[in-house]
Amino acid sequence: MIISPKIKSENDNFKIFEAVKIAFTKLNSNIKNTKGRPRKYSDEQIVACMLYGVKHSIFSLRELEYEIKKDYVFQTIINLNQIPDYSTFSLRAKTLEKHIYYGIYAMFIELIAPETRLCAIDATALRSSKYDSEAKSGKGTRLGYYRGYKLHCIVTVTDTIIPLVFDLTTANVYDNQVPDLLYEAKIYNPFLILADAAYDSVEWFEIAEKLEFNLLTDINMRKAKSIEAFIDKRYENALFFESPIGVNLYKNRLKIEQLFSVL
């Protein structure tokens, strides 16, 4: 199928595929294998297909295969001579997720250049299919007891709400069991990260101090009758949280909940 240059330039899929190719060129990730048969589909083509699914709200790989088979313009744009089946999408997507997706995402954040001085961290429940053998049971604020996964992320909350770093765990992992996110967020140079009471932990305050940024959390009283029973960093946090400045700053944490509400 031949498509005129004008139609190509006005097609969203063409623009997306061009952006994907630029990203891969910068990452220099699509190195040809010297062993075995050459791949039938390039990494750029697989990523373009996955983005096609996102753009068209396609949540099943079988449906993705079916819809792409009908879209001859898209096939021509990304130079597909044959459509990958759903199992190929699954295998290739898992490989790309480990080695490439995060690099591309970090590149897009760099291009957007959001204000990162004020951020927030939280987690949200993601219910799974009852046939998912890898899912675990846990308790979430929104769903109560459920079976599935949990998305943990740190987002900017100043003007544009953009996830900076994230992790997906099973539902049985507590919110404060992913301290690695703090280390990953360091490259964005945050000044203050806001969090709910689940993160009111000496370990988290010590990590934040080591990384040279601040952590402000809601107060987790546990069995204490007052904040006077707290020691060290937890006491300092409680005082700041109850101060007028702390109250004002903490209001921005609601923005991460707004983000989760649309997931």
Regions found by a protein language model. Name each.
Residues M1-S9:
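General nucleic-acid-binding
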Residues S9-H56:
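Basic, short loop/linker segments at the boundary and entry of helix-turn-helix/winged-helix-like folds
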Residues Q45, E67-K69, D85:
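Non-catalytic DNA-binding core/recognition domains of DNA-processing enzymes
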Residues L61-I77:
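DNA-recognition alpha helix
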Residues I77-L96:
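Major-groove recognition helix of helix-turn-helix-like DNA-binding domains
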Residues L91, K98-K210:
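Polybasic low-complexity intrinsically disordered regions
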Residues A197-V262:
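Helix-centered, glycine/charged polyanion-binding patches within enzymatic domains
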